[in-house]
C-alpha cells in the first residue's frame, strides 16, 4: 500500500469517525476470531483504535471451544440439543470458571497490551444480567435474559474504560445461567441505547442463497430480515443471530451488523468504510 492509498483510506474513514465519536457500539466477540492468534491480535487492535478515536466499544463474549476443551480435560462429555449446551450444575461450574476466570481475562489482557484500558466483568457483577431458565428448563442451567441493569457500565464508559462482559446471568436468588452471547449482546445494546450492535461470526453475513458466496445482502430492513426467516432463506445458526438483531432494533438500536470475523480488521472495515464488509440491518 502506497502513501496515497493510506491517505485515501483515512479520508474515507473520517466522516464515520466524526459521526460515531462518543457513541456506544456493542460487539459480540466469538467464533474463529477467538481461536486464531492473528485474528485475536487484529481484534484487540481494532477495539483499541475505536476507543482512541472516541467510540465507546462494549465487548460481549462467549467461549464455547474453550469450555469444551476444559470439559474434555475433566473427562466430562459436552452435550448439545438444538445447538444449545445441556448445562447441569457440574457443567455450569466449568462454564463460570472458563468464561469469567480465563476467557474474559485473556481478552482484557489482549486489549490492555495495545495501550487501551479494558475491565473484565460478568453479568453477575452489579446484577448486570438478570436471567431465568430458558423455556421449560430441559436444557438445565441455560438461561435467557429477563432484565439488564446497565448502571454498572456507565462509570466505566464515562472514564474511558472498555467493558469486557462474559455472558453469565443469574436469578435474584443467585442461580447462575449460561446465556447465548448473541442475545446478551443484543439486550445490552438495547439497554444502553447503543448506536450499533455488531456480531462477529464465521459467516460472510446474510446470504440470499445459502451456498452462493456472491449473494451477500449488504443492507436490509427489519421487514426483510423477518421475511428471510419466515421463508427459510436464513437457516440453522443464522436464525438466532438474525432474531437477536431484529429484537435489538425493535428496542431502539439504530443498526445491527452480522460480519465475518475470519477477516482481519473486519470490525473497522464494517464501521469506517463506505462499502462495509457484512450485512447491516436497519429499522
UniProtKB/Swiss-Prot annotation:
Enzyme class, broadest EC rank: transferase
GO cellular component entries: cytoplasm
Swiss-Prot/TrEMBL site (Transition state stabilizer) positions: 28, 241
InterPro entries: AceGlu_kinase-like_sf, AcgluKinase_fam, ArgB, Asp/Glu/Uridylate_kinase, NAGK-C
Keyword Chloroplast: no
This enzyme's EC code(s): 2.7.2.8
UniProt: substrate binding residues: 63-64, 85, 178
One of the record's GO molecular function terms: acetylglutamate kinase activity
Subcellular location: Cytoplasm
Main subcellular location of this protein, as a coarse class: cytoplasm
Record flagged with keyword Secreted: no
Function of the protein: Catalyzes the ATP-dependent phosphorylation of N-acetyl-L-glutamate.
Similarity comment: family membership: Belongs to the acetylglutamate kinase family. ArgB subfamily.
Protein name: Acetylglutamate kinase
Organism: Prochlorococcus marinus (strain MIT 9312)
Lineage: Bacteria, Bacillati, Cyanobacteriota, Cyanophyceae, Synechococcales
Gene name per UniProt: argB
